[in-house]
Design a protein with these regions (language model features):
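Conserved NAD+-utilizing ADP-ribose enzyme module
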Residues: 1-34, 48-52, 64-178
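Histidine-centered active-site/metal-ligand motif
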Residues: 56
Length: 178
């Protein structure tokens, strides 16, 4: 795939095997995501997940409080599929050549459900959770160290504890019900 005309920097959480290979967390989780090459999105409907084809990217912060574990860690409620595997934040480039925000804002679900954006991107807001970019192509440029991730969050005055607060309350409420 050729380099898009326009692109931006974002962040994406991956699962990394002990050998350093990256894999998506949920959709197409068995397919390796190589670094330093432009990768087109695929439409792979997956049971239990809403149909929103495309690469999902955090635009500004390497944090996703809705994917954290009950204790607030990046481990989430899932154990690694891989022996000695772990979740890692990566810096990515994502295609922004064509902006589909106006088009998807008129759709019933405010997103494409049958295709990824063609040569572009749009924003998706999932209620009170978060807003992320959905693009037809990404390029993973580097794996962030935890120190680099924390530096980015500090520069943005981003408070992980506050961001996780609503999710922590929801987790605690669910634990009381269970």
């Amino acid at each position: 795939m050729n380099t898009p005309k326009n692109y931006k920097v974002g962040y994406k959480l991956f699962e990394m095997r002990e050998d350093g290979k990256l894999f998506p967390l949920f959709i197409s989780k068995g397919k390796e995501t190589p670094m330093n090459e432009w990768l087109p999105a695929e439409n792979n409907p997956t049971k239990g997940y809403a149909a929103r084809p495309g690469w999902h990217i955090s635009m500004t912060t390497p944090d996703a409080p809705h994917l954290r574990g009950y204790d607030g860690s990046d481990l989430g409620p899932y154990k690694s599929r891989f022996k000695n595997g772990k979740r890692v934040w990566c810096e990515v480039l994502y295609n922004t050549t064509i902006d589909y925000r106006d088009e998807v804002s008129k759709l019933p679900k405010k997103c494409f459900t049958d295709k990824s954006p063609t040569n572009g991107w749009y924003l998706f807001n999932e209620g009170n959770r978060s807003t992320w970019a959905i693009s037809d192509a990404i390029k993973v440029t580097r794996i962030l160290t935890e120190e680099e991730r924390q530096d980015i969050l500090r520069q943005m005055n981003y408070d992980e504890v506050s961001a996780f607060g609503p999710y922590k309350k929801a987790f605690e409420k669910r634990k009381k019900i269970a």
